[in-house]
Amino acid sequence: MAIRKKSNKNPPVLSHEFVLQNHADIVSCLAMLFLLGLMFEITAKGAIIFVALQYNVTRPATEEQAAESASLYYYGIKDLATVFFYMLVAIIVHAIIQEYVLDKINRRMHFSKTKHSKFNESGQLSAFYLFACVWGTFILVSENYISDPTILWRAYPHNLMTFQMKFFYISQLAYWLHAFPELYFQKTKKEDIPRQLVYIGLYLFHIAGAYLLNLNHLGLVLLVLHYFVEFLFHISRLFYFSDEKYQKGFSLWAVLFVLGRLLTLILSVLTVGFGLARAENQKLDFSTGNFNVLAVRIAVLASICITQAFMMWKFINFQLRRWREHSAFQAPPVKRKPAVTKGRSSRKGTENGVNGTVTSNGADSPRSRKEKSS
C-alpha cells in the first residue's frame, strides 16, 4: 500500500487552515476529555455537570401513578455547562453529516460555489429540522398535549419538566449556539454573515425566552410547527438543486408557511392573552418561576407578533422576487426594429431611386439646385 505524501499540503499546526481542516477532530478530543473525567472519582463531580442534566427532583407517586415516582427537572446556572458540552456534540455531528453525506453528493453533482454553499446549508438544516420535529412530536404525544390543549396554560408556572422536555431545550440551545463557530469553520461569505446572525439570534432569543419564562409547553408546540414548515422548504430546495424544474414543494411550502404564521399567532394569543390572563396567580415570583404579570405577557406577545411580521415581510419579498424571475424567464424575446440611418446618402437613395437604384429622372438635391441657381 503506497503512502500518500501530505507533507507539502499539510498546513502548520494551530494555523488558520489547520484549525479549519481539523476542527472536528479537535472538538472530538475536547469532548472526550469530559467523558474520560467521568471515569475517575476526583474529576467525576465536575465532568458530570457537563454531560448529565442537572437540577432534578423526585416527585412521589400519587394514587393515580402508584407504581412509579417521576423524576422532574428545573433550570439553573449549571445548565450552561451542559449546553456547552452538547454544543461540542453538535459540531461533531455537523462535521460527520458534511463529510460523509453532503460532500459526497457535491462531488457527484458538480455544483457551483453559490449552489454549493446553499446546498450545504439546506442539507444541514433539513437533517436538524427533521430530527427535532420528530422528537418534539414524540414529546407532544407522550405528554398528551394534542388531546388536551389546555395544558399549554393550565397549572402555570411549568417550572418542572420531564427529562425529555429539558433535554429537548438543552439540545436546541446547544445546536443554535454551535451555529456561531460554524460560520468560521465553513468559511461563510461576509455578505451572508449578517443574514445568518439574524436568524440564529432569533432562534436563541425565542427558545431561551420560552425556557427561562417557564413557557416550555407553548414553546415546544410552536417549535414543532415552525420546524415542520422549515423542513419542507429546505428539502424542496435540495430537490430544486438536483432538478431546477421542481417547483411543487415550494408551492406547498408557501401555503403552509402562511398557515403556520396564523397558527402561531392564534396559539400565542390563546395561551398568553386569554389562558394566562385568566389565571388566579398573577404575581411576579422568581422563587417559583411565576412570570404571569401583564408586562411580561405584553412583551411575549409583542416579540412573537414582531417576529411573525418580519418573517411574512421576508416571505413576501421572496415570493415577489421568484415571480419576477419566472415572468422574465417566460416572457418572449422582443424583436428589435432595424435602425434607420438619417444620412444624406440614405435620403437620396429613397427619394431618387427604386430599391436603392438611382434613376435619371429623379429630382435634383437641394445642393445641386443651389449650384444651378448660382
UniProtKB/Swiss-Prot annotation:
Glycosylation site residues: 56
Name recorded for this polypeptide: Translocating chain-associated membrane protein 1
Chief place where the protein resides: endoplasmic reticulum
Membrane topology: Multi-pass membrane protein
Subcellular localization: Endoplasmic reticulum membrane
Cytoplasmic compartment spans: 1-32, 103-121, 181-192, 236-251, 319-374
Domain (TLC): residue spans on this chain: 117-326
InterPro entries in alphabetical order: TLC-dom, Translocation_assoc_membrane
Post-translational modification: N-glycosylated.
SMART domains noted in UniProt: TLC (SM00724)
Family of the protein in this entry: Belongs to the TRAM family.
